[in-house]
From Swiss-Prot:
Residues 1-7, 121-615 are cytoplasmic. Residues 29-99 are periplasmic. Gene3D superfamilies: 1.10.8.60, 3.30.720.210, P-loop containing nucleotide triphosphate hydrolases (3.40.50.300), Peptidase M41 (1.20.58.760). The keyword Transmembrane helix applies. Binds 1 zinc ion per subunit. The active site is at E419. Homohexamer. The gene is ftsH2. This is ATP-dependent zinc metalloprotease FtsH 2. ATP binds at G195, P196, P197, G198, T199, G200, K201, T202.
Length: 615
């Protein structure tokens, strides 16, 4: 509660107290309180006059002052009771309960609660963006960073060189807009940064502001829409009005998909009209926006497929910049940027770490370096070395070690042969990711063991034989259990899910079926993010085709299972030897794995169907 409101309450209660004291003090000095029995005696004697009778009291005056009082007051008593008490010669009076404070609280307390609630919400709204009170609910609430407030530059952003080159034009425009107008060119009104989470979209936007040394307005799409109708549109207007006053500047809207979803989609419920109204206002502001005003609009999203087409047309967000996962060179650059923040070992091989972190985003790499530093801290080391990074990668990829999860001897044996089956199949095929470590120490939520494979290079395409090899590697654990123990366990459930997904993709998405031919049976739905089970659910085929697809998937998996069984049977001695070493050591490193796999026998290089077709 601010100072004026606090003073108001003090003054209010002070005035109320003064009136109450006056009524109690001065009233008691001029009026005598007498018993009802005395009042009856005075009436019989004719010593009272000017009576005022109310429901509970009788007020009057003495004809002759008594004890210095001219007036009196008494509480009324029921006539029958008064007559009975008078007959008994008893002095009596009636006490009236004082309800002043109760009556006062009955209306003061609710009023105070209402005022307190009002002031609480008013203060909450005031805290948002430095605004003052509920009357400022239509303010945008964007966080403003002054010209020198953004400490990020392009030197702090690595691994996204193409995106940096695109955005460098924005910096040049903000610094010297006349250069772009020399030949009649204009800067795009809006630039949309698109990419998976953690790739550095927000960091890039801050770097643009830091390089250009201009004010930077930052707000998320969800901050525009509130419970009050019309608030979102008002905040959009206020944001652009502030930006025009402080031009040149940058407006950055993070998570644009929260604000710019396609309008009129069936199934949208509460707040739908409010969101559409807010989006319409944003579209109107972009239309009336002059690209020469010195205000650049940047936005970021990882779900461009849900954005309204009107938002992406030319003249609004007319340039899209892809901020993708970094490649090996990009990961190496990101590692070098973040390694400056820790005490790394001078002998650390950054290039090797870049190979180990395939698929990592910039945020993942930053988290990896922090985890590695924590691992080194726990072992009381002076610097962070490569072993710390490997341990951190295992923790991130496979989960935390669960040494307290004790397995019995049979379960340990099953897990050891299961993981060794994966490792043998992975080492048989040159195109499969290299095995770096095998462990039977439980990790994460449900993994009782793991075979760590990391790619040696970035891959963007996979051939049909490589996908079939991958299925064989995944089936290696289940087939090894069956070969050694004559039965299977539930440990391969996750492997079988991945096997089914790959086989289904071969048939329905990639047109790699030898029976059904070059036909795609599931159309992509356009999802940018790779969500498991989503993105390819538009079915466009008959029940007969569905039956043929199921048969082809079963045939592919069966052929790969047979190939896996033959390969493991040919290397049964290595399977048993490797499992025994795992049971003894619990973990096998890459050199130990290479030594173990020297005498592998390559058996049946192609699945059964391919061999039949080649005859």
């Amino acid at each position: 509660m601010n100072e004026p409101n606090r003073n108001f309450f003090w003054i209010f209660f002070l005035i109320l107290g003064i009136f109450w004291l006056q009524s109690v003090w001065f009233g008691s000095r001029t009026v005598q309180q007498i018993p009802y029995s005395q009042y009856e005696s005075l009436v019989k004697q004719g010593d009272v006059q000017n009576l005022i009778v109310t429901e509970n009291h009788i007020r009057g005056e003495f004809k002759q002052p008594q004890n210095g009082f001219k007036s009196f007051v008494t509480n009324r008593v029921e006539p029958e009771l008064a007559k009975e008490l008078s007959g008994a010669g008893v002095t009596y009076r009636r006490e009236i309960e004082n309800t002043f404070f109760r009556d006062l609280l009955s209306w003061v307390v609710p009023a105070l609660i209402f005022v307190a609630v009002f002031l609480y919400f008013s203060r909450k709204f005031a805290e948002k963006g430095g605004m003052s009170g509920l009357m400022s609910v239509g303010k945008s609430g964007a966080r403003l960073y002054a010209e020198t407030g953004v400490k990020v530059s392009f030197g702090d952003v690595a691994g996204v060189e193409e995106a940096k080159a695109e955005l460098y034009e924005v910096v040049q425009f903000l610094k010297s807009p006349q250069e772009f107008g020399r030949l009649g060119a204009r800067m795009p009104k809006g630039i949309l940064l698109v990419g998976p989470p953690g790739t550095g979209k927000t960091l890039l936007a801050k770097a643009v502001a830091g390089e250009a040394q201009v004010p930077f307005y930052s707000i998320t799409g969800s901050e525009f829409v509130e419970m009050f109708v019309g608030v979102g549109a008002a905040r959009v207007r206020d944001l652009f009005e502030q930006a025009r006053k402080n031009a040149p500047c940058i407006i950055f809207i993070d998570e644009l998909d929260a604000l710019g979803k396609v309008r009129g989609v069936a199934g949208s419920f509460g707040g739908h009209d409010e969101k559409e109204q807010t989006l319409n206002q944003l579209l109107a502001e972009l239309d009336g926006f002059d690209s020469r005003s010195g205000v650049v609009i940047l936005a970021a999203t990882n779900r461009p497929e849900v954005l309204d087409p009107a938002l992406l047309r030319a003249g609004r967000f007319d340039r899209q910049v892809l901020v993708d996962r970094p490649d090996r060179t990009g990961r190496e650059q990101i590692l070098r940027v973040h390694l400056k923040k820790i005490k790394a070992d001078e002998a650390l091989n950054v290039e090797h770490l870049a190979h180990l972190t395939s698929g990592f985003t910039g945020a993942d790499i930053a988290n990896l370096i922090n985890e590695a530093a924590m691992v080194a801290t726990r072992r009381k080391a002076e610097t962070v070395n490569e072993k710390d990074f490997v341990a951190a990668i295992e923790r991130i990829v496979a989960g935390l070690e669960k040494k307290s999860r004790l397995l019995n001897e049979k379960e340990k044996a099953i897990v050891a042969h299961h993981e060794m089956g994966h490792a043998i199949m992975a080492c048989l095929f040159p195109g499969v990711d290299k095995v770096q470590k095998i462990s039977i120490i439980p990790r994460g939520l449900g993994a009782l063991g793991y075979t760590m494979q990391r790619p040696t290079e970035d891959r963007y395409l996979m051939t049909r034989p490589e996908l079939l090899d991958k299925i064989c590697v995944l089936l290696g654990g289940r087939v090894a259990e069956e070969l050694i123990f004559g039965e299977v366990s539930t440990g391969a459930s996750d492997d079988l899910v991945r096997v089914t997904n790959i086989a289904e993709a071969l048939v329905t998405r990639y047109g790699m079926s030898e029976v059904l031919g070059n036909i795609v049976f599931e159309q992509p739905t356009g999802n940018f993010l790779e969500v498991p089970g989503a993105g390819y659910r538009s079915r466009t085929y008959s029940e007969k085709s569905a039956t043929e697809i199921d048969q082809e998937i079963r045939q592919i998996v069966a052929a790969c299972a047979l190939r896996t069984r033959e390969s493991l049977a040919a290397n049964l001695s290595i399977l048993k030897k490797g499992a025994a070493q795992l049971l003894e050591k619990e973990t096998l490193s890459e050199p130990e794995i290479e030594l173990l796999m020297r005498d592998l026998v390559v058996k049946n290089a192609a699945p059964q169907r391919e061999r039949d077709l080649s005859v």
